[in-house]
């Protein structure tokens, strides 16, 4: 382990929820895969506000490392008041997998991680975009940026994981990732989402609210319709 110290909720209808539950049940768990494979996973983070950096193996031989998680809990504290919480370790798996999926090797820049209730209330007074019961308050979310790939690619890769929430903020150049319910904002168009999930098996909903798995069969199309 290496540490340096230089100084909305999206509503869904009941039918969509049932569909989501069914699809989640058939999506392989990368956590289980990591345990089965005996993975060792290292996460490299840099905090935008404290200017601290950390490189730590949060998984060793497939299991979470308690000492590493404790260090990450402090690193990802509410930087405004140093309040800490127990971060959900599944979040580190999501970030590790998303970064690996896009081929990024740069440290993950953390814009926001844990938020104490006091901080969340303060931010809600400033912006309507801050959820009252934010996943940040539960230690289940991070807002991140990586310098060597576009945030659009991080967004797409994280959405494919279907492991929680994905919020895309291109104007602020970061992506929100959490391990709450599977959802994404802003929603993609039907065509955009279909390119990510050509088989239609996704919990995500497009802007028209119509689940891809419910779309009508179409006539056979030429192979490889720019679906990369």
List the model feature ranges, each with a label.
Residues 60-111:
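Active-site acidic/histidine clusters and adjacent loop/turn architecture
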Residues 41-46, 130-228:
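Catalytic cores and adjacent binding grooves of peptidoglycan-active enzymes
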Residues 97-125, 227-228:
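Extended, low-complexity, intrinsically disordered C-terminal regulatory tails
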Residues 59, 63, 114-141:
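Short, surface-exposed glycine/acidic/tryptophan-bearing loops
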Residues 52, 104-108, 162-165, 173:
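Loop/turn elements at helix/coil->beta-strand transitions in domains of secreted/extracellular proteins
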Residues 14-26:
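Bacterial N-terminal signal peptides
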Residues 29-38:
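Boundary at the C-terminal end of the N-terminal hydrophobic targeting segment
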Residues 3-17:
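Bacterial N-terminal signal peptides that target proteins for export
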